[in-house]
């Protein structure tokens, strides 16, 4: 563990930035002056981390079980004139290695700062190991160098407004938890809620997730130092995760029945839904907020950003022949799919196109405010651009 030497790094970074830039990165003095002297250039905003910020599931505008017309207009990879489907239309070349960086990913859809250069280095499935520098255990992921390495190379010589990071969910094993809960629901014999067994296991893993986030932010700071960007010259933001599922009282398929699987794409017991929404996601958020404070980073709390917009929520509807998708009424999260005909399984329970527009709006609001910790929420009945920012709760 490296947290013992991490705590003081941000406090002394300004004083040592020149040495780190000149010696640690092997830059010449002229190179450093060049990096700081391009103030007139459009500033960069960079995203690093996992699938919740890379743009996984951005292919979908809502959910539909009707395959006609590109699943009732929800499939953004579908071209109506040619009647062809190609996920590269949404994910570009990143579809080939599975990073799935969508055109509507948070950093791309954020309205602020206006005219900024957007760079999305995040990759679906990434753990902290995919972010760390090689000397601290970082390694290539999906045939790409570690994200901290990519960051250092990309921003050297360019002004940077902000670096926003989403990390921790995969270190915690969030996907494994969801899979276990779904399997518990669909098991023909002996089906039972997962919360009683998963909750204590997740609690045990939260400290390690916190350490992973702290170490990731430390290496992002180091990479920025080496690129000629001392702490304080840019904004470092760690964000949490929105809940993809409603609590058990707000699901539009009552009774723990199989229509949650066959129609809704939310195969979970009420007890598990309530645990995930009311305890799991908030606990993750609280833990990440603590990591941000230790690292000297801002914190963007997204844990309640999708309230009322989750998969199978009573206040959303699926698209169909008589219901076109819209950000006001459709779900903002991709429903659970096997990947047979409806995109990829890995898109399940990720922010879809509307959800990503909402997260982009949250980031824009964060960057418009004075640096600090904030919570982003939506406006009931309005679209994904009508997000609101308030103070983050203190834990």
Task: Please describe what each predicted stretch is.
Residues 1-36:
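Secretory targeting and sorting signals
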Residues 34-47, 51, 144-163, 216-235:
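Short amphipathic alpha-helices and their capping/turn segments at secondary-structure boundaries
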Residues 43-60, 65-77, 170-172, 353:
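Catalytic nucleophile-elbow at a beta strand-turn-alpha helix junction centered on a G-D-S/GDSL motif
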Residues 55-61, 130-133, 174-179, 248-251, ...:
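Short, solvent-exposed loop/turn and secondary-structure capping segments
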Residues 69-208:
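Conserved SGNH/GDSL esterase-like catalytic core that processes O-acyl groups on lipids
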Residues 106-118, 209-236, 277-301:
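A structural motif corresponding to the C-terminal end of an alpha-helix
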Residues 243-350:
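Mobile gating loops/cap/lid regions near enzyme active sites that modulate substrate access
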Residues 328-381:
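Histidine-centered active-site loop/cap adjacent to the catalytic His
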């Amino acid at each position: 563990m490296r947290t013992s030497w991490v705590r003081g790094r941000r406090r002394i970074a300004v004083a040592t930035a020149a040495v780190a830039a000149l010696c640690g990165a092997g830059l010449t003095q002229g190179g450093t002056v060049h990096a700081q002297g391009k103030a007139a250039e459009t500033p960069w905003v960079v995203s690093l981390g996992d699938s919740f910020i890379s743009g996984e599931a951005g292919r979908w505008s809502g959910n539909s079980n009707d395959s006609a017309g590109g699943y009732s207009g929800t499939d953004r990879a579908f071209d109506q004139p040619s009647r062809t489907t190609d996920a590269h239309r949404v994910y570009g070349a990143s579809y080939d290695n599975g990073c799935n960086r969508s055109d509507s990913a948070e950093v791309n859809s954020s309205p602020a700062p206006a005219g900024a250069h957007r760079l999305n280095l995040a990759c679906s499935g990434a753990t902290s190991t995919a972010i760390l520098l090689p000397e601290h255990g970082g390694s290539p992921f999906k045939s790409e160098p570690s994200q901290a390495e990519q960051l250092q190379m990309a921003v050297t010589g360019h002004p940077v407004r902000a670096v926003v990071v989403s990390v921790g969910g995969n270190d915690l094993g969030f996907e494994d938890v969801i899979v276990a809960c779904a399997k518990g629901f669909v098991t023909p014999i002996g089906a039972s809620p997962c919360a009683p067994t998963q909750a204590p296991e997740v609690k045990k893993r939260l400290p390690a997730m916190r350490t992973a986030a702290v170490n990731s932010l430390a290496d992002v700071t180091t990479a920025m130092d080496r690129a000629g960007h001392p702490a304080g010259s840019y904004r470092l933001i760690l964000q949490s995760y929105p809940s993809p599922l409603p609590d058990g009282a707000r699901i539009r398929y009552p009774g723990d029945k199989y229509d949650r699987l066959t129609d809704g794409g939310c195969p979970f017991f009420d007890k598990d839904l309530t645990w995930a929404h009311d305890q799991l996601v908030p606990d993750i958020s609280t833990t990440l907020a603590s990591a941000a404070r230790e690292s000297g980073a801002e914190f963007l709390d997204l844990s309640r950003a999708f309230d009322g917009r989750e998969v199978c929520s009573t206040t959303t509807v699926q698209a169909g022949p008589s219901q076109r998708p819209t950000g006001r009424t459709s779900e903002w999260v991709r429903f659970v799919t096997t990947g047979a005909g409806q995109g990829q399984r890995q898109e399940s329970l990720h922010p879809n196109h509307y959800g990503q527009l909402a997260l982009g709006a949250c980031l824009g609001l964060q960057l418009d405010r004075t640096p600090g910790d904030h919570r982003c929420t939506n406006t009931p009945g309005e679209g994904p651009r009508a997000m609101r920012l308030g103070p983050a709760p203190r834990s």
